[in-house]
């Protein structure tokens, strides 16, 4: 079992929450980004630096994450790929991507992108607030505890 973080756009506070959970539960973490993140390394935390380019980090995670792994990402197309493979994906606001909701979230994302392209909508999602951080920490704790228990009982 491993936690993968789509690290290019992941807020620092979310990474810190994941790092603390990783240490507490002894679950390895792999940060994937097109920048050097080696300073974050510990015995449980590693990183992979991919080439710069559209979806390169996403492709790496989708190809390497296994069904027993957890992926932290705000990228809905990546989450859809992970869920399709039977994996688990969580966004930085604590929302779990599931087979039931990922298609709808992908459609909504595509609509918003189209509205932005047409100039009918400006900006992106709101900045991560304290409520979001707390929701993420709670969701991560519940999910990881369950996943670790299931993984270690096999």
Curated annotation (Swiss-Prot):
Disulfide pairings: none
Similarity annotation: Belongs to the UPF0178 family.
Protein name: UPF0178 protein Gbem_2221
UniProt source species: Citrifermentans bemidjiense (strain ATCC BAA-1014 / DSM 16622 / JCM 12645 / Bem) (Geobacter bemidjiensis)
Upper lineage: Bacteria, Pseudomonadati, Thermodesulfobacteriota, Desulfuromonadia, Geobacterales
């Amino acid at each position: 079992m491993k936690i993968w973080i789509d690290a290019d756009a992941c807020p620092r506070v979310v990474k810190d929450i994941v790092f603390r959970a990783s240490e507490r539960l002894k679950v390895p973490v792999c940060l994937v980004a097109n920048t050097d993140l080696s300073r974050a390394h510990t015995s449980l935390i590693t990183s992979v630096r991919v080439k710069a380019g559209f979806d390169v980090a996403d492709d790496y995670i989708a190809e390497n994450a296994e069904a027993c792994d957890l992926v932290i990402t705000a990228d809905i197309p990546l989450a859809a790929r992970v869920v399709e493979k039977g994996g688990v994906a969580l966004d930085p606001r604590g929302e779990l991507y599931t087979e039931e909701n990922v298609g709808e979230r992908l459609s909504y994302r595509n609509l918003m992108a189209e509205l932005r392209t047409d100039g009918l909508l400006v900006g992106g999602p709101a900045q991560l607030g304290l409520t979001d951080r707390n929701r993420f920490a709670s969701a991560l704790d519940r999910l990881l505890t369950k996943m670790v228990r299931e993984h270690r009982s096999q």
